[in-house]
Structure formats: C-alpha cells, structure tokens
C-alpha cells in the first residue's frame, strides 16, 4: 500500500509540475479592450484605414448610378461630384471603418505583437508575419465592413444624384 501511495504521490507531483510549467510558460492573454485599443492605435498611427475613400470610389464607379451621372454630367464632372460626396461623408464612417480594421488586426495578432508593431519593432520575423497576415486581415475586414462600405457608397451616390435634381 505504501508503494501505491508513493506512485500516486509521484504522479500527482509530476502532473502538478507539468501544469505549473504550462501555466507559467503560456503568456497571459490580454484583455480584449487592451488588444482592441492597441490594434486601433496601430491602425490610426500607420493610417491603415485611409483607404476608405479610395475603396468607396472604386465601388461607386462600377454602379449603374455612377453611369447615369456620367451620362448627365460627363465623366470628369461625375467623378468629381462622387469623390466630393465620398469625401464629405467619410468622417461619418471612418471611425467604424478603423474599429473594424483594428478588430481584424486584433484577431490576427497577439497583444504583444501589436505592442511591438506600435513601438516600431521592424524585426524581420514580425515584418514577415505582418505581410503574411495581410490576406487574412483583408478577408476579415471584408466580412466585417462590406455593409459599412455599401452604406457609405450608397449615401454618397444618393446625395450626388439629389444634387442634380436641385
């Protein structure tokens, strides 16, 4: 019986030691708010969300509404009108766009990696991961922001059309 107790004690101590090693070795997960704030800082400081206006124009220029504006005004004036409307509306959508992009980065990177990127860590390993995750972040962003982009473009085109009627 003492042999059995000794084996149990060894097994228990070994198990506890393994658990302790795992717990101490694994970095503590950051709070979601911390990751989101860190990711949002990355997006804002590196101007990663600045493409909203450009993407809005790319989407708008492929619509029937845009073609109608071109027929009514000519290509140059239609482009100018739509770009002006997108620029006017962009501040209403930019904060949510940046938040969605930050969430996509927070999903792809750890809090520590985001902090390193914010601190200007240009280590080859982190730079390679940043490039490698670009597609994943883009797909995540598309899923999060397709409706937002659609609303942005729709409002700009509606506004542009209404300006013709006045």
What are these model-predicted stretches?
Residues 34-86:
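Early exported N-terminus immediately downstream of N-terminal targeting peptides
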């Amino acid at each position: 019986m003492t042999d059995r107790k000794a084996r149990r004690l060894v097994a228990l101590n070994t198990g506890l030691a393994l658990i302790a090693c795992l717990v101490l070795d694994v970095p503590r997960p950051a709070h979601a708010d911390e990751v989101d704030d860190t990711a949002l800082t990355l997006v804002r400081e590196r101007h990663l969300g600045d493409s909203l206006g450009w993407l809005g124009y790319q989407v708008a220029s492929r619509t029937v509404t845009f073609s109608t504006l071109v027929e009514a005004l000519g290509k140059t004036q239609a482009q100018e009108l739509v770009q002006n409307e997108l620029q006017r509306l962009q501040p209403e959508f930019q904060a949510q766009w940046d938040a969605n992009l930050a969430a996509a980065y927070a999903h792809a990177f750890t809090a520590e990696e985001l902090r390193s990127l914010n601190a200007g860590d240009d280590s080859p390993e982190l730079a390679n991961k940043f490039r490698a995750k670009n597609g994943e972040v883009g797909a995540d962003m598309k899923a999060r922001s397709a409706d937002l982009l659609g609303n942005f473009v729709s409002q700009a085109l509606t506004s542009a059309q209404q300006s013709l009627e006045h």
